[in-house]
């Protein structure tokens, strides 16, 4: 199960945070800093996308200048969540048309809607890009 999902840029600014476990505001701030300090200096060529973190694992993937991080239980399948992160980015790319950091900042409510279509209650919910995009199309018609 996911504890949280963070999208941060190279400077450590959080562009999206979704919490699936209860944390206080102080804990959230501390976690954001710790996760960024853990994943930002890692070398993509020589180090894996999985990092031990407290009693969990951080599964992360870097796209351009953004780090997509998910905190999962140690007994969860890391590769499934790594693929789910990639799937989430593919859906963002298809929805926004070559997504960038500014899309996340100015359309954060749509990004949260996409995230909620892919993940539900800390678990992977949907794995079909076409199903997610169809649902998002219906949501866009309501606006």
Swiss-Prot record:
Name listed for the protein in its UniProt record: AP-2 complex subunit sigma
Gene Ontology cellular-component terms listed: AP-2 adaptor complex
Family affiliation: Belongs to the adaptor complexes small subunit family.
GO biological process: clathrin-dependent endocytosis; protein transport
PANTHER family given in the database record: ADAPTOR COMPLEXES SMALL SUBUNIT FAMILY
UniProt-annotated location(s): Cell membrane; Membrane, Coated pit
GO molecular function terms attached to this record: clathrin adaptor activity
Job of this protein: Component of the adaptor complexes which link clathrin to receptors in coated vesicles. Clathrin-associated protein complexes are believed to interact with the cytoplasmic tails of membrane proteins, leading to their selection and concentration.
Highest taxon of source: Eukaryota
Membrane topology category: Peripheral membrane protein
Keyword terms, alphabetized: Cell membrane, Coated pit, Endocytosis, Membrane, Protein transport, Transport
Coiled-coil positions: none
Quaternary structure, from the entry: Adaptor protein complex 2 (AP-2) is a heterotetramer composed of two large adaptins (alpha-type subunit APL3 and beta-type subunit APL1), a medium chain (mu-type subunit APM4) and a small adaptin (sigma-type subunit APS2).
């Amino acid at each position: 199960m996911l504890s949280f999902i963070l999208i941060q840029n190279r400077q450590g600014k959080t562009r999206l945070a979704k919490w699936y476990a209860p944390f206080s505001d102080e804990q959230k701030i501390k976690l954001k800093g710790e996760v960024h300090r853990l994943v930002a200096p890692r070398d993509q060529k020589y180090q894996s996308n999985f990092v031990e973190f407290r009693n969990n694992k951080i599964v992360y993937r870097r796209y351009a200048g953004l780090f997509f991080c998910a905190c999962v239980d140690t007994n969860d399948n890391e590769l499934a969540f790594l693929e789910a992160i990639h799937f989430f980015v593919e859906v963002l790319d298809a929805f926004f048309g070559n997504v960038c950091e500014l899309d996340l900042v100015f359309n954060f409510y749509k990004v949260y809607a996409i995230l909620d279509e892919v993940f539900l209650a800390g678990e992977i919910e949907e794995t079909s890009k076409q199903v997610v995009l169809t649902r998002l199309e219906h949501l866009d018609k309501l606006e």
